[in-house]
Design a protein with these regions (language model features):
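C-terminal binding/interaction regions
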Residues: 1-24, 68, 77-144
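Short Gly/Pro-enriched turn/cap motifs at secondary-structure boundaries
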Residues: 26-28
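A short glycine/serine-rich beta->alpha loop
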Residues: 49-56, 89-93
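A short mixed-secondary-structure module that forms the rim of ligand-binding clefts
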Residues: 53-72
Length: 144
């Protein structure tokens, strides 16, 4: 765990981008706005937000939006770090939220292809830091 002001500048930038992306979230049903930002191997940042749909569960989580966009825009390039932030109408969550199982598995597939992807989960009071996606999903699908 860490506080925002204890992080390196590059990690603060990644979290800031994830926080910015909550504003692009389309969440009229849940009112839960999530942003994700991925730092690529070339230091660029690719980001996404959750996009809901009335035909639930046809929406897409922020983490998958970001990783699929990263893979489409920079195919084959390793994803080194992901930051996730969530907000409701009053503001950002005090405690970090974690990716759902589907997002963990999707991120893990890219991690298996290109090596560890560090995970930063933002909360106003604290930030959880994980060395890899695999550390969030100990009993994952491994045969792919």
């Amino acid at each position: 765990m860490a506080r925002y002001d204890e992080l390196e500048e590059k990690d603060r930038q990644l979290i800031d981008r994830a926080k910015e992306m909550t504003r692009t979230s389309y969440a009229p049903y849940s009112q839960f706005f999530v942003g994700a930002a991925i730092r690529m191997d070339n230091d660029s940042i690719i980001a996404g937000s959750n996009q809901e749909n009335a035909a639930y569960p046809s929406g897409t989580c922020a983490e998958r939006t970001a990783c699929y966009q990263a893979s489409a825009l920079l195919p084959g390039m390793p994803m080194r770090k992901i930051a996730v932030a969530a907000a409701t109408k009053p503001g950002f969550q005090r405690r970090p939220i974690s990716p759902c199982g589907a997002c963990r598995q999707a991120l893990l597939e890219y991690e298996k292809l290109h090596g560890p992807m560090e995970v930063l989960l933002y909360g106003e009071e604290e930030i959880y830091i994980f060395p890899s996606v695999a550390s969030l999903l100990p009993y994952c699908f491994t045969d792919f």
